[in-house]
């Protein structure tokens, strides 16, 4: 496999970047559109949808279940019924949202549906969701990929207890389909911790936007009443998690990066993202339709609990590795990342140490002591976030090569182009002002149709 030489920015990066739509919001909107269509409410439109491997897998899954998806690029329409054909088989790839959101949908069908995925996906946690479906009366063969869901045309619902310590997607997957259950659904989380809670809040917010009656006022308990799921137009926000890699470029280079389309009010965990950037002495400026981050001249190590936003861990670990030499950062609340696309804690520790850094695992996180890094290969482990972390390291360390930049197709197929356009031909442009006759670079992922 050909490696990707990560561009280096010997001077501060100055750029405006447009990132495509949110993967998390796109796939939730697609599931809700499918449920609305299956209830006979009509077609829904998704505008600004992300087109990436994860969302293509979701589109394929819905079509496998018998639904119809029309449109090109980022404008999609979902209609039809849940009527899977004989031998229906859903490919989950490495997409956790497909793996955990689609089985409850399949339970509403009337024929068995087999689920499988990439070899690497077979280690991802799924048993608690399958056990919950069994508790609700669904026949399920298997405890992990591959498994088979035997739909019988309806699902009574009721109350289910589930340990979602390994993934908040277990809860979201049940809640998304719950309004179509005869008696609705009450979900009680029984585990000691709940990672990525803002993503459950996103699910609840989008259910309300679809007219679903959901009560999440009691911690670790959610109640969805049976009723209609409205067909509607979904306008997808830019993917703020993907934007963090680009904003990190401003932090590590002392430059300025502006993200277009940053929402004033978001269903994504925007506040958590901005709090981390401010902790690193970055200046965050909101405009009407953008967010600008001005990086510091330097920053020390930091302590941060990433339980709510574990997806940010690879980017934050890269920032920690590039902090002031000798300073120590502690990343906590992320034990669940051992069950993500790869064991992200082990992968980050291995790769930072491979480049001469000092990183060790703890029971629920990482401790990183910033030391000068050297050139070398950064392995991505087929993980999009790991590939992006290698790109961040490469901004400051010449000679870093990412072994599998194509892993970014999972959520951002345009990443290599956007990154190169942001950095420019071998270097960034100075902050606070570009040189005479020059303008800040602009990188956009819109209109690609991905």
UniProtKB/Swiss-Prot annotation:
Q: Does the keyword Amino-acid biosynthesis apply?
A: yes
What does the record give as the function of this protein? Catalyzes the transfer of the enolpyruvyl moiety of phosphoenolpyruvate (PEP) to the 5-hydroxyl of shikimate-3-phosphate (S3P) to produce enolpyruvyl shikimate-3-phosphate and inorganic phosphate.
Source taxon at top rank: Bacteria
Cite the binding residues for 3-phosphoshikimate. Answer: 23-24, 28, 167-169, 196, 311, 340
From the UniProt record, report the name of the gene that encodes this protein: aroA
Q: What is the protein's species of origin? A: Mycobacterium bovis (strain ATCC BAA-935 / AF2122/97)
Family of this protein: Belongs to the EPSP synthase family.
The UniProt entry, under Pfam families, shows: EPSP_synthase
**Record localization:** Cytoplasm
Q: Name one GO cellular component term.
A: cytoplasm
Keywords annotated in UniProt: Amino-acid biosynthesis, Aromatic amino acid biosynthesis, Cytoplasm, Transferase
Catalyzes what?
3-phosphoshikimate + phosphoenolpyruvate = 5-O-(1-carboxyvinyl)-3-phosphoshikimate + phosphate
Q: What is this protein called?
A: 3-phosphoshikimate 1-carboxyvinyltransferase
| EC code(s) of this entry | 2.5.1.19
Q: Which residues form the active site?
A: 311
Q: How does it assemble?
A: Monomer.
> Mind telling me which Gene3D superfamilies this protein's record contains?
Enolpyruvate transferase domain
Keyword Iron found: no
Where is this protein chiefly located? cytoplasm
Question: PROSITE patterns, from UniProt?
Answer: EPSP_SYNTHASE_1, EPSP_SYNTHASE_2
Binding residues for phosphoenolpyruvate: 23, 96, 124, 169, 344, 385, 410
